[in-house]
């Protein structure tokens, strides 16, 4: 839960911008080219624009935002994108204004508060590794905090690896004229993760407190080969095959977690 500082009396609107970025990876092993193609098709359908729109709509509700506009698109051959423009308060009463005013209100908030998601399925051409990445950005202006949606987003997607960045920018001024560069307490993104999530993941932080930049990356602690096999069971594989596949998957997870290729 976000812990606010003592309530400030502000001069005008709260101008702080809070941005939360997610990179979520799902890693899989598919033995044949046909299985890898079916994995891509499965992921493409599982996380199509309609499903992603529902997830982001839920995020808007969780953080207490009002939806202004939704744009979504499925791509050929694969992938999807959704952008939702949001505001802290209802911008306009549709019954009291025409379409032109509503459109202007949407444009005015476009660069301030929004939620976006883009998906990137891909496969290794030879080794059977297939990955799915979802990039999610939640940017808010005002008192709304994107950190409230952390746990929901992790649970909603198949999150083997999660890389998160949170930053606060701008300032808000109180009635005495003093500038405030953050309006809640935080020393790590981990502060806002549920206990059951923290117990399942290995986590690592890089934070720059004086710049209000917070970075957390995490991956699942337990490795169950069956959870990574597509259309296959570990019990049907030979010991040698299991060891080979497990090594490939663990290497892929390690490289994605650290963001660099490991030496042979």
From Swiss-Prot:
Keywords: Autocatalytic cleavage, Decarboxylase, Lyase, Polyamine biosynthesis, Pyruvate, S-adenosyl-L-methionine, Schiff base, Spermidine biosynthesis, Zymogen. The modification Pyruvic acid (Ser) is found at residue 113. It catalyses: S-adenosyl-L-methionine + H(+) = S-adenosyl 3-(methylsulfanyl)propylamine + CO2. The active site is at residues 113, 118, 141. GO terms for biological process: spermidine biosynthetic process. Binds 1 pyruvoyl group covalently per subunit. Is synthesized initially as an inactive proenzyme. Formation of the active enzyme involves a self-maturation process in which the active site pyruvoyl group is generated from an internal serine residue via an autocatalytic post-translational modification. Two non-identical subunits are generated from the proenzyme in this reaction, and the pyruvate is formed at the N-terminus of the alpha chain, which is derived from the carboxyl end of the proenzyme. Its EC number is 4.1.1.50. The record marks 112-113 as: Cleavage (non-hydrolytic). InterPro entries: AdoMetDC_fam_prok, S-AdoMet_deCO2ase_bac, S-AdoMet_deCO2ase_core. Coiled coil: none annotated. One of its GO terms (molecular function) is adenosylmethionine decarboxylase activity. Signal peptide: none annotated. Its cofactor is pyruvate. Pathway: Amine and polyamine biosynthesis; S-adenosylmethioninamine biosynthesis; S-adenosylmethioninamine from S-adenosyl-L-methionine: step 1/1. GO terms for cellular component: cytosol. Heterooctamer of four alpha and four beta chains arranged as a tetramer of alpha/beta heterodimers. Belongs to the prokaryotic AdoMetDC family. Type 2 subfamily. NCBIfam families: SAM_DCase_Eco. Catalyzes the decarboxylation of S-adenosylmethionine to S-adenosylmethioninamine (dcAdoMet), the propylamine donor required for the synthesis of the polyamines spermine and spermidine from the diamine putrescine. PANTHER family: S-ADENOSYLMETHIONINE DECARBOXYLASE PROENZYME (PTHR33866:SF1). This is S-adenosylmethionine decarboxylase proenzyme. It comes from Stenotrophomonas maltophilia (strain R551-3).
């Amino acid at each position: 839960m976000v812990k606010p500082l003592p309530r400030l009396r502000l001069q005008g609107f709260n101008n702080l911008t809070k941005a939360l970025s997610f990179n979520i990876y799902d890693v899989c092993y598919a033995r044949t080219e046909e299985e890898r193609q079916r994995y891509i098709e499965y992921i493409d359908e599982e996380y199509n624009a309609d499903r992603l729109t529902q997830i982001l709509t839920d995020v808007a509700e969780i953080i207490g935002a009002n939806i202004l506009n939704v744009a979504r698109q499925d791509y050929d051959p694969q992938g999807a994108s959704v952008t939702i423009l949001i505001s802290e308060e209802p911008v306009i009463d549709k019954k009291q204004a025409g379409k032109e005013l509503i459109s202007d209100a949407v444009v005015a908030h476009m660069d301030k508060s929004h939620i976006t998601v883009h998906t990137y399925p891909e496969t290794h051409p030879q080794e059977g590794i297939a990955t799915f990445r979802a990039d999610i950005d939640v940017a808010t202006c005002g008192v709304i905090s994107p950190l409230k949606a952390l746990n929901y987003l992790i649970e909603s997607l198949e999150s083997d690896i999660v890389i998160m960045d949170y930053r606060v920018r701008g300032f808000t001024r109180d009635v005495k004229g003093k500038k405030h560069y953050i309006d809640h307490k935080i020393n790590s993104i981990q502060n806002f993760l549920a206990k059951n999530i923290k117990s399942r993941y290995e986590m690592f932080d890089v934070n720059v407190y004086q710049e209000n930049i917070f970075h957390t990356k995490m991956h699942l602690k337990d490795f169950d080969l069956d959870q990574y096999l597509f259309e296959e069971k570990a019990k049907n594989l030979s010991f040698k095959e299991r060891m080979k596949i497990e090594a490939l998957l663990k290497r892929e997870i390690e490289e994605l977690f650290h963001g660099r290729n490991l030496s042979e």
